[in-house]
Amino acid sequence: MVASKIAWKFILPNCFKAKNDRNILPSETKIIQICKQINSDHHHSRLAISDISTDSRSVFISLDDLSSNAIIGSNLHIFTYAELKIITSKFSSANFLGKGGFGPVHKGFIDDKIKPGLKAQPVAVKLLDLDGNQGHQEWLTEVVFLGQLRHPHLVKLIGYCWEEEQRLLVYEYMARGNLENHLFSRYSSCLPWSTRIKIAVGAAKGLAFLHGEEKPVIYRDFKASNILLDSDYKAKLSDFGLAKDGPEGDDTHVSTRVMGTHGYAAPEYIMTGHLTSKSDVYSFGVVLLELITGRPAMDKNRPIRERNLVDWARPMLRDFHKLDRIMDPRLEGQYSTEGAKKVAALAYQCLSHQPRSRPTMSNVVKSLEPISELTDIPIGPFVYVVPSSECDKELEIGALKSKLDEEKKMNVNEDEQKGARRHGHRHKHRPKSSAAAAAVYSDTHMQNFALSHERTNKKHILK
């Protein structure tokens, strides 16, 4: 094993500016032979970001080199900027999906009319914000990592665009957006407990895959907004711009400048810059807390003691008698008590101040999977909710439905009593009206019911 890094220029000499011809020394000949061996093994071993680091001014990786099989294989399609303008309708506001640290994201649609061999499907196109905090290096990191890594719980990178200053990435479209919006947006309905566990298991599997690679990958920016959900709430990790190659051999950590998101980063990483896979485990513990509590990692609108989620909630994770104090009130008790205890205990381990005390992500997966099979979830009352993006309307309709249920039951009881008195004892066992018929209501029923109550209230006020 060669201790020093092997210069990329020996593998792809056309990436570099021409230098004066000179004789190659025997030692360099040996390095070239080793590099050729590495190059021939690229289909077996993942290319590390450090191999193509652009820190040196003498290094320049061309588009041709990037698209060659020697770097990322032939998994990715290369799009022109004009093609991406077509599929996103010139990046129209109607197709705007959101904006992250990298830049804005727009929805588009690709098929074989754009490029031969393309599968017809919706896509998400991410455009680098030239005035933002990220740049070419983060874009290149994303291309290199996702160009080589394939897993059911990693978002699929379909292709990219590199034209002059423009840097774009084309991903599979994730219909339900990111976890952050589902948990914290006031316009989103409450995620059921079973869905939250499913998301946690999927995200954990994605991290476990990265950590278990022959050349480990440290995600470094694990958070709710980077967990994307498909139409079936299958979780996939996205945004690999800050990912780093993990330590290999006898190394215990990677020393790097502190990057990531406040509230999610592990304390030892913030203090020392020492990055390990256990740094990701800590971040996963924060997201587990968000799933349990329905609160974001940092919330300036809370009282001072509750602004940092970990500081507020972690002390209560070990005391199951206090667990109900931190459970998301929107769940309304509809969760497995045993499952909540197990998730709380796991989150407590992940958030340990000692990195060595945190579990590996593979063990996290083993702990979470059985929780998804627990069935001790209370059965709540049926509530009809009119599809709406406004939570206030949903709550109002739900309340109206409950009241309507009560009145219908009262009417049914009155009718039965009258019928019994009218027709005698032999009619007492007459089949009752179907309860299912009263379980579904149309929008019109709800509106009429609301209007009738409004008129009744007005009459009472006039009296």
Curated annotation (Swiss-Prot):
ATP binds at residues 97-105, 126. Its EC number is 2.7.11.1. Residues 91-383 form the Protein kinase domain. The active site is at 221 (proton acceptor). It comes from the Eukaryota. Its main location: membrane. Belongs to the protein kinase superfamily. Ser/Thr protein kinase family. Required for pathogen-associated molecular pattern (PAMP, e.g. chitin and flg22)-triggered immunity (PTI) involving reactive oxygen species (ROS) accumulation and triggering plant defense, including defense-related gene expression (e.g. PR1 and LOX). Ensures specific recognition of the EPD1 effector of Verticillium dahliae, resulting in a hypersensitive response known as effector-triggered immunity (ETI), characterized by the activation of programmed cell death to limit infection by the pathogen. Interacts with the V.dahliae elicitor EPD1 (AC G2WWH6). This is EPD1-interacting receptor-like cytoplasmic serine/threonine-protein kinase.
